[in-house]
Amino acid sequence: MSINSSKQPASSAAGLIANTTCQTENRLSVFFSIIFMTVGIVSNSLAIAILMKAYQRFRRKSKASFLLLASGLVITDFFGHLINGGIAVFVYASDKDWIRFDQSNILCSVFGISMVFSGLCPLFLGSTMAIERCIGVTNPLFHSTKITSKHVKMILSGVCMFAVFVALLPILGHRDYQIQASRTWCFYNTEHIEDWEDRFYLLFFSSLGLLALGISFSCNAVTGVTLLRVKFRSQQHRQGRSHHLEMVIQLLAIMCVSCVCWSPFLVTMANIAINGNNSPVTCETTLFALRMATWNQILDPWVYILLRKAVLRNLYKLASRCCGVNIISLHIWELSSIKNSLKVAAISESPAAEKENQQASSEAGL
């Protein structure tokens, strides 16, 4: 498709959408868009501050690599809210009149690129974090010697560049991103699918997203099973496993949030790609799936805000007090210190220790 012909879909799509647009309340949609954008930006900003502070405090390799990837994920969510939310509010404020403010289809293309990138990149980073933790738990020697912060930064850059490449594929193939039926967002062509290329972009996007979720699930399952086996087999290195446990809990929460939020949208896009113009998917269904996917960028930062040792410890104490249970300062992250205390007590009660104490007291008497 030539560049001149690529400019035509903006106006033609807008004309077709005029008859198939979703019936949405403009004022209510503007209000919710502003609320979602504000909450997302504030939440991700708070999570970025927490992760950066944790990265400065924990310089150990096993923690630093995870925190770098987590920071990249939250920063991606932050800019996704900032760009996508800002464009959406502008579209609503302009009464969704794309022909008037975007005749050249530039804004729609930017919107579509940002939608694809901010959708796939967090999923890719989530699977990368799961792989990193799986290696750290199953092969700690290789992780500590081969996976450095420099390597993690290179991997982070590579993941982001691949997500950018996927987002730019339609532009490189001289295809425009299309205004969707609700006239509030832009994405791949989901209406009036003409050829295999339209189906390819939708299937490629859905396949990559579902693959990332599958990798996260597999790696987290292996990590969890390994930690359980080590726990029952040996009681050494509790403190090291406590860091693994905290990060795995966060990974499981991210995976659950991503699956719940993104699966409907990914399956919907795959359904449209497979069935084409005969797809039973309605505009309202697609818009609902999109809004669920948007919630992923809001919930992701709260995983790092809430699922921290200090917060969980306080929540545990609060819940126990509310239930009327007497609390002993005992939780999973303090087992190592208790074990060390027991070891010290056992050594102090041994005969050798008693002799040393008697010699020390006699010398003190002299």
From Swiss-Prot:
Cell compartments where the protein resides: Cell membrane
SUPFAM superfamilies: Family A G protein-coupled receptor-like
Top-rank taxon, per record: Eukaryota
Primary location group: membrane
Tissue distribution of the protein: Highest expression in pregnant ovary. Also found in a low extent in the kidney. In the brain, expressed in astrocytes and oligodendrocytes, and meningeal fibroblasts, but not in migroglia cells.
Topology versus the membrane: Multi-pass membrane protein
Sections of the chain in a coiled coil: none
GO CC terms of this entry: cytoplasm; extracellular region; plasma membrane
Pfam families reported for this sequence: 7tm_1
Disulfide linkage: C108-C186
GO BP term, example: negative regulation of apoptotic process
Family indicated by similarity: Belongs to the G-protein coupled receptor 1 family.
Job description of the protein: Receptor for prostaglandin F2-alpha (PGF2-alpha). The activity of this receptor is mediated by G proteins which activate a phosphatidylinositol-calcium second messenger system. Initiates luteolysis in the corpus luteum.
UniProt-recorded name of the protein: Prostaglandin F2-alpha receptor
Species annotation: Rattus norvegicus (Rat)
